[in-house]
């Protein structure tokens, strides 16, 4: 069954970037649709759970305490060839602090924020095709 929806903004993928883009588009008044093929937003568990306090501030987001698994000071990055790089206040010029996120909770709360701003959502839905109406000259 194909479902046709007319929207101003179509966002494919309800990860952090998609949900945040949908939230801001809807907040600015765009008729927004967020589509995700997974049956549950935030699953399966994804990588990239650590984020520094500095980058949180740059993003301009407030992290809900329910999303925080633990606070961190520094980090060790391990590459595919097992090379390790350690980042702590002892070996770089600034103190790195941040959080490890519960991505399942974090991703869901970002999607809820988008919905609260007026975003329509379709989960367990794969985007097959789309067309663009160029009436505005774009």
Which ranges hold each PLM region?
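Beta1/beta-strand and adjacent pyrophosphate-binding region of the FAD-binding site
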Residues: 2-17, 33
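Short, basic and Ser/Thr-rich N-terminal targeting/leader segments
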Residues: 5, 70-73, 123, 136
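Glycine-rich FAD pyrophosphate-binding loop
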Residues: 10, 26-46
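Short alpha-helical segment within the catalytic ATP-binding CA
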Residues: 19-20, 50
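N-terminal FAD cofactor-binding segment of flavoenzymes
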Residues: 42-80
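Conserved N-terminal helical subregion
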Residues: 77-138
